[in-house]
Amino acid sequence: MCPPVSMRYEEEGMSYLYASWMYQLQHGDQLSICFTCFKAAFLDFKDLLESEDWEEDNWDPELMEHTEAESEQEGSSGMELSWGQSPGQPVQGGSEAWGPGTLAAAPEGLEDAGLDPHFVPTELWPQEAVPLGLGLEDADWTQGLPWRFEELLTCSHWPSFFPS
């Protein structure tokens, strides 16, 4: 059960984190952790999410080496690729002509063919597309609060109802 997002807590001078802890304490599973330890676990979790030490399971070192080698080649040639341009394509026009409000001209014949000049080709069919927006549950990283951990958090200065 996710804590409700409410402006009422801010009006009462209560932080969202404290309101979430209170909500979980009242309506959630058996929470055996004081707010101080809850906040410390939350900040540790936040630091973990924001750290650059995250490694994905599908990380491929060969791909990273290939990408780094390409970026070094591009940097040494003095050419920068624009969006949608592959490494083998010549640069079309200078970047100094680009400014706010400048639109790219569509290639000749696109207007005649009835294609949208802002069309970006993909390899997905419409039925395969996934919306980019996050759901309500995932929209805020604070939804990963400490009670989402699989293990039950406890602290030494919170009254325990279970024999140790």
From Swiss-Prot:
Entry keywords, A to Z: Cytoplasm, Differentiation, Meiosis, Spermatogenesis
Localization in the cell: Cytoplasm
Highest rank taxon of the organism: Eukaryota
Tissue specificity: Expressed in testis. Expressed in undifferentiated embryonic stem cells.
Gene Ontology BP annotations: cell differentiation; male gonad development; male meiotic nuclear division; placenta development; reciprocal meiotic recombination; spermatogenesis; transposable element silencing
GO MF annotation terms: piRNA binding
Low complexity bias (residue ranges): 84-95
Description of what induces expression: Down-regulated by gonadotropin suppression sufficient to cause marked suppression of spermatogenesis and additionally progestogen treatment.
UniProt keyword annotation of Calcium present: no
GO cellular component: cytoplasm; nucleus
Keyword Cytoplasm appears in the UniProt entry: yes
Region (Disordered): 56-112
UniProt region (Important for interaction with piRNA), positions on chain: 111-159
Main subcellular location of this protein, as a coarse class: cytoplasm
Region (Interaction with LIRE1): 1-68
Physiological role: Required during spermatogenesis and placenta development, participating in the repression of retrotransposable elements and prevent their mobilization. Collaborates with the Piwi-interacting RNA (piRNA) pathway, which mediates the repression of transposable elements during meiosis by forming complexes composed of piRNAs and Piwi proteins. Interacts with Piwi proteins and directly binds piRNAs, a class of 24 to 30 nucleotide RNAs that are generated by a Dicer-independent mechanism and are primarily derived from transposons and other repeated sequence elements.
Protein name (Swiss-Prot/TrEMBL): Testis-expressed protein 19
Lineage, highest ranks first: Eukaryota, Metazoa, Chordata, Craniata, Vertebrata
